[in-house]
Amino acid sequence: MSTVQVPKLNTKDLLTLEELTKEEIISLIEFAIHLKKNKQEPLLQGKILGLIFDKHSTRTRVSFEAGMVQLGGHGMFLSGKEMQMGRGETVSDTAKVLSQYIDGIMIRTFSHADVEELAKESSIPVINGLTDDHHPCQALADLMTIYEETNTFKGIKLAYVGDGNNVCHSLLLASAKVGMHMTVATPVGYEPNEEIVKKALAIAKETGAEIEVLHDPELAVNEADFIYTDVWMSMGQEGEEEKYTLFQPYQINKELVTHAKQTYRFLHCLPAHREEEVTGEIIDGPQSIVFEQAGNRLHAQKALLVSLFKSVEELS
């Protein structure tokens, strides 16, 4: 049994990283590192987590299911298309019914508004496993990976190059929360959501973080400690081939990384499209830590699950 204190969270759900304080994020990361060293701890014995998927998944499904098993609980896969919700049952009714059967819900879907409604109407914790707007579990794992490499966030520069998508949104909020310097470089028209950038800038004023949204990839990666990218076409965007030409200057390759620190590390949330957003030379090279990063999804989510479940128990 763990001797490390389980972090107390002042939230029932995790829909975006706005809901966590800097202190809570750091505590979750430290707890995740502990769980990484002590995989089999039955901290959620007998608990059931419902896993609702409307989008394809490898890392999210396997890491949540494996995490629940390692914690002594059970992950129950629920296909959104096969549930009554896929045939017109309301999100509200679904939330209330599932609250009678299971102990928590993880949902990976398109509409962030649906996840917000699910959380509002359920009496059990709801975790956002990905929406079109946010990917908080990925960002937690990313912060954990950076922290393992540097043991600090102060003075660390993270450069995100590519599409200003859901991953970028969560990284902006994450970087702002922990006081990190984050630069984003996207083509014109593919910047991150303006409202989310405003939120990140407001948080940064309180934490001392530095947030920049640019269009020059060389300027963005200048002296960066970490370079991060994602696919140019997210699920549901296939067929927008004109993006390839527009995004080509934003490819992470050996020329671009010369502007970063020599000791930079490469991050990618995966799946990757080699020779599109990143060359094989970079993602398979010695400075890439993408598979360690993917592995940390398991540990960060385990820490989150235990903390949310325990915090809700104490509040009830």
From Swiss-Prot:
Q: Known InterPro entries for this protein?
A: Asp/Orn_carbamoyltranf_P-bd, Asp/Orn_carbamoylTrfase, Asp/Orn_carbamoylTrfase_sf, Asp_carbamoyltransf_Asp/Orn-bd, Orn/put_carbamltrans, OTCase_ArgI
Q: What is its EC number?
A: 2.1.3.3
Localization: Cytoplasm
Keyword annotations for this protein?
Amino-acid biosynthesis, Arginine biosynthesis, Cytoplasm, Transferase
Specify where it is mainly localized. Answer: cytoplasm
Instruction: Establish whether keyword Cytoplasm is in the entry.
Output: yes
Q: What is the recorded name of this protein?
A: Ornithine carbamoyltransferase
